[in-house]
């Protein structure tokens, strides 16, 4: 089911939560809403669900005006961060709850629960209670319960926010695979930019109640529309173009390191090193002044991402290896000018 948000605004007292927002979500897509706290993303999600009323504007579901439609008429499944499972019901009964309320055929209920347990890979835990499950397992049950009634739209509000980092990574992959098997139109709110980049087909970036940019993960990361998006969606390094008297940004993976200076290279000293399974992160202090702005602090610290292979190659070429205090020369492979900003 498609979703069309048309000129939606919402105010709480004197706080403008949403300011004339327009957004189209295509049927079957997987969309992430990201932005700082208070930017309006959760408010919009609740409006789509029918939990909040707009001050102005319209919400269209599958081409029909649903602005004032009651929750039960919207055919929407909603999953919150805190699971909201019934503690006194086992896994199977939690999943079947919505179907039983609708007085579905008992055979259909059993079949649907069986299919969903298989889908979330918890067939062996059908008789367990929520207290006997891990956080990740409880969240999968919550998703299955939302899917049991075959919603046209699935809304997820910080679905993995209460889980530890390892479980979140596992569930990101699981959610992506789940959506491929059951391509229900899905909109989820997250504070984790990396989660949005890994899971979503399309990302919507909010800031102060307005949309800053809508696009694919690649578009958002490589071609940010505004300085805010640039700084919010991943780490950025800043440089100054003395010829054009403007500022530019470089992503950490678009920096080349060298052992000797070359044209347009910048010298710097390694002040931090972070080891990863497949990559290395270097923090290099470059003696240049970058003007401060509302989207980035003043500073000269560049972060550089290298594959372990490239790092090992450079490490073998430098006497004593790359270590804290080593002097390197860096050069941007690709830069983006900061639109609307100059020094």
From Swiss-Prot:
Annotated Gene Ontology cellular component terms: ATP-binding cassette (ABC) transporter complex; chloroplast
- Known EC number: 7.3.2.3
Which major enzyme category is it?
translocase
> Which reaction(s) does the protein catalyse, per the Swiss-Prot or TrEMBL entry?
sulfate(out) + ATP + H2O = sulfate(in) + ADP + phosphate + H(+); thiosulfate(out) + ATP + H2O = thiosulfate(in) + ADP + phosphate + H(+)
Concerning SMART domains, the annotation shows: AAA
The residues that hold ATP are 35-42
| Positions of transmembrane segments | none
Q: Where is the ABC transporter domain?
A: 3-233
Give the subcellular location: Plastid, Chloroplast
The protein's superkingdom reads Eukaryota
Q: What GO MF terms are annotated? A: ABC-type sulfate transporter activity; ABC-type thiosulfate transporter activity; ATP binding; ATP hydrolysis activity
What keywords sit in the KW lines? ATP-binding, Chloroplast, Nucleotide-binding, Plastid, Sulfate transport, Translocase, Transport
The entry sums up its family as follows:
Belongs to the ABC transporter superfamily. Sulfate/tungstate importer (TC 3.A.1.6) family.
Annotated function:
Part of the ABC transporter complex involved in sulfate/thiosulfate import. Responsible for energy coupling to the transport system.
What is this protein called in UniProt?
Answer: Sulfate/thiosulfate import ATP-binding protein CysA
* Organism annotation: Nephroselmis olivacea (Green alga)
